[in-house]
C-alpha cells in the first residue's frame, strides 16, 4: 500500500468549470475504484460534507490560507508530512513536493492566444507549466494535442507524458422528465428555437465571431435564439457591446453561470450545441452535449476534432460564413440533427470517469514504485 495525496482544492469550488469538474469527478472515481490505498485530500477550505463519500481509507486535510495556498501552505504541509505519491489534478505543483509527484496539464492555450490572458497570467502560466513538466515524475495530458505541445514547447520527453482522456458527468443524458424540463425553462426563460453555448465568457471562446455568425441568421429572417450560459471571465465586456452593435438584444440570452444540475435539461432543449473556441485542451462541454443527444458544432482546431470524432460538424473558427452555414444546416435539416445525435451518443461511450480513474491510478502506482 502507498499513501496517495491529492490536491483537491479545486474540487470544492462553488462554481465549477472544466478543471474543477475534472478534479471533482476524477477524485470521486478514484475513491470508488481504490479501497486499498489510503488517500489524503488537501483543501484550502473545509469541503462540504457530501463532496466525497466517507470512507475508512480517506483523510480530509483542510488548511485555510489567504493567498498562494499551493506554493506556501501546501508546500509547508509537504515538508514534514509528504505522502508517498502526490497527485495534482490541475496544473500546479507546490514548490515543495515529494519526488514521486504526478500533475495533469490541461492545455497550453496561453501560447497560442496570449491576448486572452493578462501579461502577469501569461508569465505565470509559462513558468508553472515549464516547472511542472520538469519537476513532476510524470505528467498526464488531456489529449494528444496537449502532449505534443508539452514535448515541443516544454521539452518533455515522450515517455514522461501519458494521455488520459477525462470522462463526463453521467448525469448528462437526454432529459425526458417533462416537469424537470419545464422547471428549467421557467428558470431560464428562452423563447422558441435556440442553439446553446456553455462555458466561460472569455476571448479564447470566440464568442464575438459566434455573434457575427448568428447575426447572419437573424438577417435572413429566422426566428431563432442564442443562449450563452456561463460566468463572466476576463475581457467579457466587449462581448456585450458587440451584441448591441449587431442589434441582437432580442435574440441573444445570457444566463450567467448555470449550476451543473440544470445543464442537462438546458442542453437537451436546444436545437444544437456550439463551441467555436480558438483553442481547447480537451473540450469537455461537447461530450456533455453529445451525452444529452444534442447535435454539436465545434471548431476544427486543437483537441476538438480528437474528442468529437465523426460526431460533430467541424468548422474553421475564423470563418464567420462557415459557422453561419453550419448553424443553418442544423436548423433546417431534421435528418442531419438525428444522425448527429446518434453519432454523439456512440462517441461518448469512449469516455468515462471510471476509465480515466483506472488509467490514472495505474500511473500513480507506477510512480509509487519508483526508486
Region roles according to the model:
Residues 1-371:
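Carbohydrate transferase catalytic cores enriched for Leloir-type hexosyltransferases
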